[in-house]
A protein has these predicted regions:
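Short alpha-helical segments enriched in small residues
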Residues: 2-177
């Protein structure tokens, strides 16, 4: 995936986000049907997206690895997220989510890249970037989709919702091909 590809933010979130289990099954089965692979880069979800994928029978045919890049330094070192992007936009931004997708796709040479960054709380939120703000990106072929979400609940609820949203966005990206 070239870094010069189109990146945009979807204007409307999904009306309904299915469960992580259901979305993972849909994603793994579609990837298997079209003989493609997925890689992940996760921050606030801490591996939950990868765990949901590998919980599906047959995942080994479509999933090679994932990155957990919780701190900025890991995002930069492992995924190539620009220090300037991190400084200007912060780790919780559409720009960083897009660069995470580019970076993990390049590192793992997968067809589909899913990335998640956000604030799961309970601390760390601001008026501009409240707890529950999550950016999910999906890189497929020549484009990266970035979706902004505002989830509610405790830390685990926010992480679970972000996981389900990432898997659903990945599935949506494949269906839109």
């Amino acid at each position: 995936m070239k870094k010069t590809t189109l990146c945009w933010r979807m204007l409307e979130p999904f009306e309904e986000i299915l469960s992580a289990k259901e979305n993972a099954q849909n994603l793994v089965h579609m990837l298997a049907d079209i003989d493609q692979t997925v890689i992940t880069a996760e921050s606030c979800t801490g591996g939950l997206v990868s765990a949901a994928i590998v919980s599906v029978a047959g995942a080994s045919a479509v999933f090679g690895n994932g990155f957990i890049t919780y701190c900025d330094e890991a995002k930069h070192r492992l995924l190539g997220v620009s220090e300037e992007t991190l400084d200007v936009y912060t780790a919780v931004s559409a720009e960083v989510a897009a660069e995470m997708a580019y970076g993990c796709a390049a590192a793992g040479q997968a067809d589909l890249a899913l990335a998640v960054t956000g604030l799961a709380g309970p601390d760390g939120g601001t008026e501009e970037k409240p707890v529950g703000l999550v950016y999910v990106s999906s890189g497929y072929r020549d484009r990266v989709l970035v979706q902004e979400y505002h989830f509610s609940g405790d830390r685990e609820a926010i992480r679970a919702q972000a996981t389900a949203a990432a898997l659903q966005l990945g599935y949506f990206s494949l269906r839109a091909r």
